[in-house]
A protein has these predicted regions:
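C-terminal polymerase-core module
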Residues: 131-183, 223-284
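Residue-level preference for well-ordered alpha-helical positions
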Residues: 73-77, 112, 116, 237, ...
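Non-catalytic nucleic-acid-binding interfaces of large nucleic-acid enzymes and RNP effectors
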Residues: 1-36, 43-45, 66, 91, ...
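Short, surface-exposed acidic
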Residues: 60, 77-94, 119-125, 136, ...
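Short, amphipathic alpha-helical "recognition" segments used to contact nucleic acids or chromatin
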Residues: 93-104
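Extended, well-ordered alpha-helical scaffold/bundle regions in very large, multi-domain proteins
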Residues: 104-143
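Acidic, glycine-rich two-metal-ion catalytic cores of nucleic acid-processing enzymes
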Residues: 1-86, 143-144, 148-215, 229-236
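Catalytic palm subdomain of template-directed nucleic-acid polymerases
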Residues: 50, 107-120, 216-233
Length: 284
């Protein structure tokens, strides 16, 4: 379902689509004879979109640094310039919590609980974060206010969300939709990027076999695989530039035989198949 969510992201059926099912089911994915599969996904797409749409240079530099959370810790002067994920995991973890909380509407109470600190210290960190990335927050606040005045939100390509009420009711409780409004322009433009990439890849005769949130899976003949893989990655980067005005890098996972799982999912698949094997002789 290409426009199945309010943000315009795809929403395939969990009972009919392998990437919406439990992860162990991905073991059934396998390229056709004479082909490889490749899974291409946009790396840290949401923060990249935030930076490019708002023009916040601190956000953009944080994304382009390769590690948003370590870069933010450096902006707070909490780690040295040569800090890495390996050398300062604790500080990195702090700014991962703060980043997600500020960008998606969590309050200081939730942050304090996650960081095991006082609410006042959580407020201080969150206010500092908003000050460092003030261009982004000024943009998102303005985007929401302007959209509410029009009573609808819109992406640069015209996908819209019409606002009838600022509240939803769930299980008899009234809830403000502010968090989803903060997230909407980011996710919706992510959907636009994926659609643009799909169009451009199809125009260049790539066989797109799956769409997965911010990723595509392609099937490419082995003799031309290396060249076509690089072409596909560049097409996806170019699609991000068309939509949000800046390049979003693309990671790759090549599948030459059956899909390789993480250990816990592989164990579950093996367990399920062993149970099936026990019963198979009974019906032969």
């Amino acid at each position: 379902n290409m426009f199945g969510t309010v943000t315009g992201r795809t929403s395939p059926s969990s009972s009919k689509y392998v990437f919406s099912a439990s992860k162990w089911a991905r073991n059934f994915i396998k390229p056709g004879l004479g082909n490889y599969l490749v899974y291409l996904d946009y790396k840290s797409q949401e923060p990249a979109i935030m930076g490019y749409l708002s023009g916040d240079q601190n956000k953009i530099k944080a994304y382009q640094s390769g590690d948003i959370y370590i870069h933010t810790a450096k902006l707070f002067n909490m780690v040295p310039d040569n800090a890495t994920k390996q050398s300062h995991p604790e500080e990195r973890g702090i700014f991962k919590v703060i980043d997600l909380a500020n960008n998606f509407g969590q309050g200081p109470g939730a942050v304090a609980e996650s960081l095991k600190c006082s609410v006042s210290h959580a407020k201080f960190l969150m206010n500092q974060y908003r000050n460092i990335f003030k261009v982004y927050f000024r943009w998102i606040d303005g985007f929401i206010e302007n959209s509410l005045n029009k009573t609808y939100f819109s992406t640069c390509y015209g996908w819209q969300r019409h606002i009838k009420s600022l509240f939803t009711t769930k299980e008899g409780k009234k809830k403000h939709i502010h968090k989803s409004l903060l997230n909407w322009p980011i996710q919706a433009h992510g959907g636009e990027i994926l659609r643009q990439a799909l169009i451009d890849l199809t125009d260049e005769n790539f066989k797109v076999v799956a769409l997965v949130h911010d990723a595509v899976m392609l099937e490419i003949p082995i003799p031309e695989f290396k060249q076509r893989l690089e072409e596909a990655k560049q097409i996806m980067v170019d699609a991000s530039i068309k939509v949000v005005g800046g390049p979003i890098t693309v990671d790759q996972e090549i599948i030459k035989s059956n899909y390789e799982q993480e250990t816990k999912d592989q164990k579950l698949f093996n367990k399920i198949m062993s149970h099936i094997d026990r019963y198979t002789p009974l019906y032969n």
